[in-house]
Structure formats: structure tokens, C-alpha cells
Amino acid sequence: MKLQLFAHKKGVGSSRNGRDSESKRLGVKRADGQFVLAGNILVRQRGTKIHPGVNVGKGKDDTLFALIDGYVTFERKGRDKKQVSVYPERKVAQN
């Protein structure tokens, strides 16, 4: 009597997909007109999409942070650049 044995599990190839990098949580962290404390992060970014303005520092990874306690203001810098500043008093819009 001959006994024929078969594999009881099918051989499975591995997929070359199925991995992704963790998100970096970039973007604007404080809104226009919001009160911030010195050291608060205003924007996390790669490159200077938004430039540092008055009372705003820039970290080595281009993170913008408040240098003083005050109110956040997003402004235009020329025609095509944006900047964020922090002022001790709330800025009133001039019409």
C-alpha cells in the first residue's frame, strides 16, 4: 500500500506592499488672532512656506514659534510670501 502525503498548507508568497511612514503632523497649530505664550509652536512645516515675522523664531526644522506672549497675526510679505507675527496687543483691521 502506497501512502501519498500532500502539503496541508498552501505555500504563500509575501506581498511587497503593506508599509507606510508615520504622518508628521505638519501645519498651522495656532489660528489668526489667537493668544499664545512665548515658546508656543505656531507652524510646523518643511521648508519656509510661511516665514517668521515680528516676535517669531524659526527652529532648525523650519518650525515657527512665538518669542513673546501675544496675539498671532498672519500677514502677506510682498506679493507671494506669507509670514506670521506675534504682537503684544491685538491688531485691529484698518479699512
From Swiss-Prot:
Transmembrane segments: none
Gene Ontology CC annotations of this record: cytosolic large ribosomal subunit
UniProt keyword annotations, A-Z: Ribonucleoprotein, Ribosomal protein
Propeptide: 1-6
Entry PTM: The N-terminus is cleaved by ribosomal processing cysteine protease Prp.
Classification via InterPro entries: Ribosomal_bL27 (IPR001684), Ribosomal_bL27_CS (IPR018261)
Source taxon at top rank: Bacteria
Chain intervals for the UniProt region annotation (Disordered): 1-25
Any one GO biological process: translation
Molecular function terms, GO-annotated: structural constituent of ribosome
Family: Belongs to the bacterial ribosomal protein bL27 family.
Name this protein carries in UniProt: Large ribosomal subunit protein bL27
The organism of origin for this protein: Thermoanaerobacter pseudethanolicus (strain ATCC 33223 / 39E)
Lineage: Bacteria, Bacillati, Bacillota, Clostridia, Thermoanaerobacterales
